[in-house]
UniProtKB/Swiss-Prot annotation:
Its job: Could be a protease inhibitor.
Lineage of producing organism: Eukaryota, Metazoa, Chordata, Craniata, Vertebrata
GO cellular component, one term: extracellular region
Listed name of the protein: Whey acidic protein
SMART domains, alphabetized: WAP
Domain of life: Eukaryota
Tissue expression remark: Milk-specific; major protein component of milk whey.
Location relative to the cell: Secreted
Cysteine disulfide links: 32-56, 49-64, 78-109, 90-113, 96-108
Keyword hit for Repeat: yes
Signal peptide span: 1-19
Keywords: Disulfide bond, Milk protein, Protease inhibitor, Repeat, Secreted, Signal
WAP domain residues: 26-68, 71-121
């Protein structure tokens, strides 16, 4: 019985720790969609809107609309990696599909035969 109680308390502590851990949030831009005639909820700021809607400019001043989320492009370019000349299919699984899935400054780049999180090559600007 003591083992079950200890296990339950351990699981509760783990759940609490995971809930407090900072989550990775990729940088994004929020854009307002084109206004439609069916939108009637007027607003002055995002605080006037419900749920995930935001206050967007409209002919009436402002209306609550569901925003368009656009990923912010990351700096740099992917390093060049020569693909191996293999006669068989690649059996590696990709780690990512686009840059928004990568932490920090890393980019989602082709490496050998799958997509990987890689450090970008930053272009130097001529002075």
């Amino acid at each position: 019985m003591r083992c079950l109680i200890s296990l339950a308390l351990g699981l509760l502590a783990l759940e609490a720790a995971l809930a407090l851990a900072p989550k990775f949030i990729a940088p994004v831009q929020v854009m307002c969609p084109e206004p439609s005639s069916s939108e009637e909820t007027l607003c002055l700021s995002d605080n006037d809107c419900l749920g995930s809607t935001v206050c967007c400019p409209s002919a009436a001043g402002g209306s609550c609309r569901t925003p368009i989320i656009v990923p912010t492009p990351k700096a740099g370019r992917c390093p060049w990696v020569q693909a191996p000349m293999l006669s068989q299919l690649c059996e590696e699984l990709s780690d990512c599909a686009n840059d928004i899935e990568c932490r920090g400054d890393k980019k989602c780049c082709f490496s050998r035969c799958a997509m990987r999180y890689l450090e970008p090559i930053l272009e130097s600007t001529p002075q």
